[in-house]
């Protein structure tokens, strides 16, 4: 093998023969130009409206009847920015008929990062199907690291520590951390506004973003617009391990969903309610969604 970068490329080709989601390797060593290369950032990015170029969440009022929220990433490091933006514009969202949430190209992150959106979507109890975690010392290290991550609040960190201890007590087994296959979330209030919520999706959505969509799809207010998502959720909760040479990292899923085999998402994806076909220029996607929500 000429070098570690080519080794990583060949390993990914071999891995992709078996499955696409939540397993692979990234080359993280130096290239000739001194840049780091990963499989993720080599993937093509759809050219679209300027909001898609934003690396941070942004909010706009498009017109009297419609507000727009762009969320490019659900990484836990983005939670504070997402929550702050939503809080600053909460009154506007709650007084506007239509709400567009644009998650195109959002690859996932942490479920906690979309929690502040749920009160706007909620219309009835939300069912979230759980998962089993495979317990080993290496796998469990991720849960311990989450319990020490400053981006999570103290309650979450305490919960992660409890999960870690439960996993350590059951090594070599698949562990149900939540002691139930389905969690049901009930809220006291159904907000009258926004009345209609359009979530814009595409083929680059996976992982936590697809979990957000499974939650949102249970709302009577929500329609999904765009293209079928990537399909990368059944095997999830990624752990990352660096090779001894330090040039390659392996990422792989730690959990398997109770949804499978009855409702698989991996390599299938989630379909939109309203398909945006290729005759509609990517520059006009948001105009299309806006007009559809406004009944035009």
Write out the residue ranges for each language-model feature:
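Extended, charge-rich low-complexity interaction segments
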Residues: 127, 132-134, 158-176, 255-271
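Flexible, low-complexity junctional segments that flank or bridge functional domains
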Residues: 1-155, 193-196, 223, 228, ...
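Conserved active-site loop/cleft motifs that coordinate metal ions or position small ligands
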Residues: 251-253
């Amino acid at each position: 093998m000429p070098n570690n970068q080519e080794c990583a490329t060949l390993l990914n080709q071999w891995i992709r023969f078996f499955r696409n989601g939540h397993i692979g390797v990234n080359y993280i060593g130096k290239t000739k130009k001194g840049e780091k290369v990963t499989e993720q950032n080599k993937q093509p990015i759809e050219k679209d409206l300027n909001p898609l170029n934003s690396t941070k969440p942004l909010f706009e009022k498009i017109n009297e009847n419609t507000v727009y929220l762009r969320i490019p990433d659900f990484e836990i490091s983005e939670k504070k920015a997402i929550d702050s933006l939503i809080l600053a514009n909460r009154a506007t969202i709650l007084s506007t008929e239509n709400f567009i949430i644009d998650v195109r190209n959002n690859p996932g992150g942490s479920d906690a990062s979309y929690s502040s959106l749920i009160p706007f979507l909620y219309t009835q109890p939300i069912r979230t199907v759980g998962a089993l975690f495979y317990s080993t010392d290496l796998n469990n290290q991720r849960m311990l690291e989450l319990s020490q991550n400053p981006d999570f609040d103290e309650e979450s960190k305490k919960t992660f520590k409890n999960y870690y201890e439960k996993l350590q007590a059951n090594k070599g087994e698949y562990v149900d951390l939540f002691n139930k296959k389905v969690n049901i979330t009930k809220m006291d209030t159904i907000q009258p506004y926004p009345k209609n919520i359009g979530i814009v999706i595409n083929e680059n959505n996976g992982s936590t973003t697809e979990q957000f969509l499974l939650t949102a799809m249970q709302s009577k207010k929500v329609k999904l617009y765009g293209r079928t998502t990537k399909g990368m959720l059944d095997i999830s909760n990624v752990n990352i391990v660096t090779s001894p040479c330090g040039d390659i990292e392996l990422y792989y899923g730690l959990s398997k969903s109770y949804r499978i085999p009855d409702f698989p998402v991996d390599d299938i994806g989630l379909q939109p309610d309203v398909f945006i076909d290729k005759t509609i220029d990517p520059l006009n996607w948001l105009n299309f969604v806006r007009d559809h929500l406004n009944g035009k």
